[in-house]
UniProtKB/Swiss-Prot annotation:
GO terms for MF: sodium channel inhibitor activity; toxin activity
Protein's recorded name: U11-theraphotoxin-Hhn1h
InterPro entries: Toxin_22
Biological role: Probable ion channel inhibitor.
Main location: secreted
Pfam families: Toxin_22
GO CC, any one term: extracellular region
Region called Disordered, residue ranges: 61-83
Tissues of expression: Expressed by the venom gland.
Keywords: Disulfide bond, Ion channel impairing toxin, Knottin, Secreted, Signal, Toxin
Region forming the signal peptide: 1-21
Presence of the UniProt keyword Signal in the record: yes
Localization annotation: Secreted
Length: 113
């Protein structure tokens, strides 16, 4: 009976000591995986930040191009009604009172000089 108790006690001590070693190893593995995950997340975050900065630069470039060309788009073409006090006709056009077809509308139109 004593040998059985001693055997069980020995097996119990071995299981407990090996089990604790496994817990420590598991804990260390989990810490390594967490650190790797953090480094991966940092890398992904930096990559996403670079892509967003590139996209923002492209959008700002397009906006600046639009503002550069916006003056030409706001000008009025030939045969379009204009305001006599604030003519916005193209540079080669003049805001004049129409001679025939626009008399009925009582409006000014952009004509060639």
């Amino acid at each position: 009976m004593n040998t059985v108790r001693v055997t069980f006690l020995l097996v119990f001590v071995l299981v407990v000591s090996l089990g604790q070693a496994d817990k420590d190893e598991n804990r260390m593995e989990m810490q390594e995986k967490t650190e790797q995950g953090k480094s991966y997340l940092d890398f992904a975050e930096n990559l996403l930040l670079q892509k967003l900065e590139e996209l923002e630069a492209k959008l700002l470039e397009e906006d600046s191009e639009e503002s550069r060309n916006s003056r030409q788009k706001r000008r009025i073409g030939e045969g379009v009604p204009c305001d006599e006090n604030d003519p916005r006709c193209c540079p080669r056009l003049v805001c004049l009172k129409p001679t025939l077809h626009g008399i009925w509308y009582k409006s000014y139109y952009c004509y060639k000089k």
